[in-house]
């Protein structure tokens, strides 16, 4: 993207009102007690785009997990939960529970504050987070009514977890076993494991090729269960941005979700002027960029978009 285009986007966003032009906009998040954060650490979201930067272990992902739990039907405990090896401190010396407070603008443009606490659910789940009435201990006015959790579509793309269909099988096997996969990963085993997996991929890639070339739409497996979804053709706008980000000129591309290699996963196909290739011959940054651009250009308006570990893959 040219500097002029970036500047134009920033100018447009600066002219927009966070309270009027963005539905249920999260304007601030505060952490009375959260992980190893300093008490009442606060982040203001005074611009629609926020980039969290810092060394490893400074809490960037932890902030994303909290924001993920802000809208209704989403829960921070899906990503941060207690185990025998990594227990979570229930409360600090002042009896303040693990918590965060986020501020947002309601439909009338009025800023509201909502407290979220990590509590024991009715079903006995200790990793459940629930909104709470305002409590003085958490810096809120108890006389104020409890707002409802914001109703907002959310998309969380954590690129640490995005693995292509090819990489899932080649590095972890059909059942995700690691015993031989680790040896393969570090070059300690180049015989049977390599040969078995290459033979399997060569055989099953014929099915993938048939779908990518449009010869077949859906391939059924045992009991007539579909082994893939319909291939998605990337739009001209998607191809433009993928080319811009990666610095190559692509003419077309496809995304397909399938289980030809044993487990469900995504494959991509990118075509340049004289050749095309799948994620098997693409870098992890190419694969991640295709999914990122496709998802961002197809989300609903006023969605909360959280991106984790993006720069690591685009370096």
Model-derived features: where do they sit?
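Extended helical coiled-coil dimerization/tether regions that scaffold
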Residues: 2-18, 161-281
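Short, flexible loop segments at the rims of nucleotide/cofactor-binding pockets, characterized by
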Residues: 29-30, 281-283
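P-loop NTPase switch/coupling surface
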Residues: 1-193
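A short catalytic or substrate-binding loop motif that flags glycine-/basic-rich loops and adjacent residues
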Residues: 91-96, 259-262, 284
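Catalytic acidic motif of RecA-like/P-loop NTPases
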Residues: 50, 310-314
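Secondary-structure boundary elements
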Residues: 22, 244, 248-249, 297-304, ...
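GG-anchored amphipathic helix commonly corresponding to the ABC/SMC/Rad50 NBD signature/C-loop
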Residues: 67-70, 267-276, 282-307
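Glycine-rich, often proline-containing surface loops adjacent to acidic residues and nearby aromatics
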Residues: 25, 46, 301-309
């Amino acid at each position: 993207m040219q500097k002029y285009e970036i500047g134009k986007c920033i100018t447009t966003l600066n002219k927009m009102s966070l309270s009027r032009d963005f539905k249920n906009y999260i304007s601030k998040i505060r952490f009375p007690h959260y992980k190893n954060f300093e008490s009442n650490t606060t982040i203001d979201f005074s611009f629609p785009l926020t980039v969290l930067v810092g060394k490893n272990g400074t809490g960037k992902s932890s902030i994303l997990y909290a924001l993920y739990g802000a809208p209704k039907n989403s829960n921070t405990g899906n990503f941060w939960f207690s185990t025998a090896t990594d227990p979570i401190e229930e409360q600090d010396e002042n009896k303040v529970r693990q918590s965060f407070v986020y501020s947002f603008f309601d439909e009338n443009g009025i800023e509201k504050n909502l407290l979220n606490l990590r509590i024991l659910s009715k079903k006995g789940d200790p990793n459940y987070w629930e909104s709470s009435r305002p409590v003085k201990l958490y810096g809120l006015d108890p006389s104020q009514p409890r707002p409802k959790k914001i109703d907002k579509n959310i998309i969380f793309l954590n690129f640490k977890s995005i693995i292509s269909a090819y990489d899932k099988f080649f590095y972890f096997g059909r059942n995700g076993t690691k015993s031989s996969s680790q040896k393969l990963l570090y070059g300690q085993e180049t015989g049977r494991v390599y040969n078995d997996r290459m033979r399997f991929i060569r055989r099953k890639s014929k099915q993938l090729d048939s779908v990518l070339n449009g010869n077949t739409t859906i391939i059924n497996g045992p009991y007539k269960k579909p082994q893939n979804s319909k291939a998605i053709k990337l739009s001209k706008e998607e191809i433009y941005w993928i080319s811009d980000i990666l610095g190559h000129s692509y003419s077309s591309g496809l995304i397909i979700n399938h289980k030809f290699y044993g487990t469900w996963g995504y494959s991509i196909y990118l075509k340049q002027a004289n050749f095309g290739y799948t994620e098997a011959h693409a870098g992890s940054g190419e694969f991640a960029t295709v999914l990122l651009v496709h998802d961002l250009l197809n989300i609903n308006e006023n969605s909360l978009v959280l991106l984790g570990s993006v720069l690591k893959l685009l370096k």
